[in-house]
UniProtKB/Swiss-Prot annotation:
One of its GO terms (cellular component) is extracellular region. Coiled coil: none annotated. It comes from Bombyx mori. Its main location: secreted. It holds the Pfam family Lipoprotein_11. Transmembrane segments: none annotated. This is Low molecular mass lipoprotein PBMHPC-19.
Length: 254
């Protein structure tokens, strides 16, 4: 082997050796910063290298920190890993909810405050569609799946009720408080049918605030109980961040 090639090989090897000697807390900071500034390609490459070097705990610690700090970028980071051939990293280093989301598995959306599962009414309300509300989690009509869409360096979701084959949207009109009622519709070419998720941690639970793209309002269940006994679903015109126990949703396998 020519001396120049030997020197080059030794140099490359030294770079990897130096990287392997970097303390985990520094590696965590570097990866965390890549995610927070939305440099997802860099975050994916760092994650792949860490995973190959058997340092998956670095990725797990970063994911936990992102969730604790309510960083929406955590969703984009996970989606890009999933999209770029690193589903194993999402399965091994993220909470199970992320795999359920990006694999488009059938799920239940469980409102933390009431322990009720989101579903759609049997009745159709005019041109708006089927009203969405909270129901006992054992109902067969509480099955949903999230369908990811990538646009402008951000991941959005269509939320499909698998029983009705209808999409979750917010109505155009509002109540006296400025809230938009949620419905299930067959199809809609509007940001009203797109949503984005913000992860949160409450006790030992991983939860998600679910925001509508059109109105930037979080999906919640009403505090008022209807005569039918249901709590209707609304896009809430108020602050929700910091109170996941009141306004966030759990994602469970159906």
């Amino acid at each position: 082997m020519k001396p120049a090639i030997v020197i080059l090989c030794l140099f490359v090897a030294s770079l990897y050796a130096a990287d392997s000697d970097v303390p985990n807390d520094i590696l965590e900071e570097q990866l965390y910063n890549s995610v927070v500034v939305a440099d997802y390609d860099s975050a994916v490459e760092k994650s792949k290298h860490l995973y190959e070097e058997k340092k998956s705990e670095v990725i797990t610690n970063v994911v936990n920190k992102l969730i604790r700090n309510n960083k929406m970028n955590c969703m984009e980071y996970a989606y890009q890993l999933w999209l770029q051939g690193s589903k194993d990293i999402v399965r091994d280093c993220f909470p199970v909810e992320f795999r359920l989301i990006f694999a488009e598995n059938a799920i239940k959306l469980m409102y933390k405050r009431d322990g009720l599962a989101l579903t759609l009414s049997n009745d159709v309300q005019g041109d708006d569609g089927r009203p969405a509300y909270g129901k006992d989690k054992t109902s067969p009509r509480v099955s949903w799946k999230l369908i990811a869409l990538w646009e402008n360096n951000k991941v959005y979701f269509k939320i499909l009720n698998t029983e009705r084959n209808q999409y979750l949207v917010l109505g155009v009109g509002t109540n006296w408080n400025g809230d938009h009622m949620a419905f299930g519709v067959n199809s809609v070419d509007s940001f009203r049918a797109q949503w984005y998720l913000q992860p949160a941690k409450y006790d030992n639970d991983v939860l998600f605030y679910i925001y509508n793209r059109e109105y930037s309002k979080a999906l919640t269940l009403s505090r008022t109980v209807e005569p039918s006994g249901h709590r209707m679903a609304w896009g809430y015109n108020g602050r929700v961040i910091g109170s996941p126990e009141h306004y966030a949703w759990g994602i469970k396998a159906f």
